[in-house]
Amino acid sequence: IHKADTRGHSQYDWLDSYHTFSFDEYFDSDRINFGALRVLNDDKVAPGEGFQTHPHKNMEIISIPLKGHLQHGDSKKNSRIITVGEIQTMSAGTGIFHSEVNASPVEPVEFLQIWIMPRERNTHPVYKDFSIKELERPNELAVIVSPDGSTPASLLQDTWFSIGKVEAGKKLGYHLHQSHGGVYIFLIEGEIVVDGEVLKRRDGMGVYDTKSFELETLKDRKSTRLN
């Protein structure tokens, strides 16, 4: 279990960032990764500021806006502004330069940035963004990213992303896509119980050595699952 207040923290004039796993100047030998999940950053960027053009190589990168508008630009001439209800994925492959900045001059942008280590290296860089609103269902977990082409965007790794909003007092069962894998749960808002453990806002938990498990919501919540 990774409690929210145990995460690494980087703070600059323009950025307030929490790191579930080792990143930037935060290093914990026990928190390098969870399977292929290498980075899970909870970022808040000041108006008009952001991550200027920088390179990535051989990494699957997913950005999920939680508030505000996030502007992406890259060396493959992709340019897009995404907001809540949309996500973007990028397979960096042989290499790509990109920027992510706050598109608003007056309001902060908050988003999750997630890095997944790919199973294939030096592939052709690919960018994709899309709406997840049509995929979401009340009190269900919707698969929004997968490796098998069943979702609008695919990753070069045996990884599934699920996201959902669930009312208080509901119970949900979850079956792993692969029996030898694991699931990482990140609670965006609310309070839930998983295997007797209570998770609160921005807590994370890895689940493995099981084929399925159940969660119960104590407060309305939105969570992201990485399987």
Report residues per predicted region.
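A short glycine-rich, His/Asp/Glu-containing loop-to-beta-strand
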Residues: 9-55, 60, 111, 118, ...
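Tight coil/turn sites that cap or link beta-strands
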Residues: 42, 47-48, 67, 85, ...
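Glycine- and acidic-residue-biased ligand/ion/polar-headgroup-sensing regions
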Residues: 57-73, 84-87, 174-195, 201
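Hydrophobic, well-structured mid-protein blocks that either form specific transmembrane helices
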Residues: 83-138
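Conserved small/polar residues in nucleotide/adenosyl-binding loops
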Residues: 220-227
